[in-house]
UniProtKB/Swiss-Prot annotation:
Binding residue positions for ATP: 91-101
Catalytic residue list: 8, 133
SUPFAM superfamilies (alphabetical): GHMP Kinase, C-terminal domain (SSF55060), Ribosomal protein S5 domain 2-like (SSF54211)
BP GO terms, sorted: isopentenyl diphosphate biosynthetic process, methylerythritol 4-phosphate pathway; terpenoid biosynthetic process
PANTHER family membership: 4-DIPHOSPHOCYTIDYL-2-C-METHYL-D-ERYTHRITOL KINASE, CHLOROPLASTIC
Residue stretches spanning the membrane: none
Chain's gene name: ispE
Function: Catalyzes the phosphorylation of the position 2 hydroxy group of 4-diphosphocytidyl-2C-methyl-D-erythritol.
EC number: 2.7.1.148
Keyword Nucleotide-binding: yes
Pathway named in the protein's UniProt entry: Isoprenoid biosynthesis; isopentenyl diphosphate biosynthesis via DXP pathway; isopentenyl diphosphate from 1-deoxy-D-xylulose 5-phosphate: step 3/6
Protein name according to UniProt: 4-diphosphocytidyl-2-C-methyl-D-erythritol kinase
Gene3D superfamilies tied to this protein: 3.30.230.10, GHMP kinase, C-terminal domain (3.30.70.890)
Amino acid sequence: MLSKAHAKINLSLDVIGKRKDGYHLLKMLMQTIDLYDLIEIKKIKKDIIIDCDREYIPKDRRNLAYKAATLFLDRYNIDSGVRINITKNIPVAAGLAGGSTDAATVLKIMRDIFEPDISNEELKEIALDIGADVPFCIEGGTALCEGIGEKITPIKNFKNHILVLVKPNFGLSTKDVYNNLKVEKIYIHPNTTKLIQSIEEDNLKSVARNMRNVLENVTLRKYKALNSIKSNFIELGALGSMMSGSGPSVFGLFDDMLKAQICYDNMREKYKEVFITRTI
């Protein structure tokens, strides 16, 4: 069984506190985009086997797809195994939920193969044990995600808007970015209410004005290339530009495909991983 595993971007990301166990409390608007990995799963007699077209992708318990399969088989006492083939298109360590969406897609395919009556809500319970972005990736679309990612409120879908996406030639550790964030020194927070209103009105310019990611407080200081990419996007006609998640991917939001194509061509001269895509 074959399925697409779609990436996500953040239209906003706010950190509003920190729990005693070290987890940060988040308030973020998440958006599915039409950039995806392909996941194919076949039922086998035993074990979990991961195949991938990229050598650098782990094929053991470090892979979230492996973890998803393990949790599913254990939870439902399934006495068989799966072979999972991953065709990677989403950049890794990029703030695009590449591993999380693969894990979510594994859960959905395994439901179809083994336990078709399981609800999405039940899948989200398993998903939260894998990672904070995985529950959102079960359904995707446009949603307000709160807590550590487990509180998901769907909003009007902000679909079919043009993006150019740049993944610089380095990765970032989500853990390191959050560890270097000083919550008490976040002085400007996203206006999430205004952003949701702009999305519901499909007001692209207002969405662009209200996009904000507080993790840029950490990354823009350390990685000057991210400032340069954001500036280049605006110079090349983007309505707004922001880092997605914990980075380092940066996207520009466009209202014109010709401008987006010119921007894409320009960015391709500097960066290897550049994509034109849309919100879905």
